[in-house]
């Protein structure tokens, strides 16, 4: 099963990639929502970890586009700018988790396990 990570922050994206790889998962990373949407990886993704606040399309915009195009994999939303309205919108649109940066890696592991079991 493949996990995609979308985050415009190189340091965060690379750290998450190393962490998820250390758990034994296949990982692809993208610096923007647009890059992910235009990739062939989209059809092989089982779980998406996406930042919510990015230039161009936000993580919420990405989630909306994925739903509109029939992609139904599990989404874990992360943000450095936690906001209750944004959390509610992400969860109502189908995200299985909303994590504020910095987040506890044990929580991420739990959400990844949940996402991949449901995939």
Give residue ranges: language-model regions.
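Acidic, metal-coordinating helix/loop segments flanking the phosphotransfer/catalytic sites
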Residues: 29-47
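Acidic catalytic/metal-coordinating carboxylates
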Residues: 31-32, 58-61
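Short amphipathic alpha-helix used as the core "switch/output" element in two-component signaling
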Residues: 38, 60-72
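Active-site residues of response regulator receiver
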Residues: 51, 79
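Receiver (REC) domain active-site loop signature in two-component systems and cognate sites
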Residues: 54
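Alpha4 helix (beta4-alpha4-beta5 surface) of REC/receiver domains from two-component response regulators
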Residues: 61, 82-97
């Amino acid at each position: 099963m493949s996990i995609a990570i979308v985050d415009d922050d190189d340091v965060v994206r690379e750290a998450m990639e190393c962490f998820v790889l250390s758990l034994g998962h296949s990982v692809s990373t993208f610096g923007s929502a647009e890059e992910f949407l235009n990739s062939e990886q989209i059809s092989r993704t089982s779980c998406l970890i996406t930042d919510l606040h990015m230039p161009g399309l936000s993580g919420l915009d990405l989630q909306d586009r994925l739903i509109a195009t029939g992609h139904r994999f599990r989404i874990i939303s992360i943000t450095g700018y936690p906001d209750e309205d944004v959390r509610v919108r992400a969860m109502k649109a189908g995200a299985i988790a909303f994590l504020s940066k910095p987040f506890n890696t044990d929580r991420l592991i739990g959400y990844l396990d949940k996402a991949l079991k449901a995939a």
